[in-house]
Amino acid sequence: MTIKLTSKDDEKRAKIFKALSEVKRIEMIRYLVRHPEHKTCGEVGESLGMDKSNVSYHLKILYEAELIHIYRRGQNKYGQLREDTFNAFLPGFLDSL
């Protein structure tokens, strides 16, 4: 596996590294890796002992870095990993969690 090395992706790389610079966000990614079945954003936060506003804040940053996809089903929001982003920019990272 190779990591993309074009300069046009530098801004995206910076967003990814900034998003992963917070321990809580890494814990959220780890939770989604270990629980691949679809989990609501509330379930993610509850399992990590986070209140709703903190969960929303951290998920937004992960979403903006294209590390997760957030979708709505009914009244619930769900978080799902964007494995394509991890494979392109951080190959092997998800396996290390």
PLM feature spans:
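N-terminal leader segment of winged-helix/HTH proteins
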Residues: 1-20, 65, 81, 88-93
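Alpha-helical residues within the helix-turn-helix
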Residues: 46, 57, 63-64
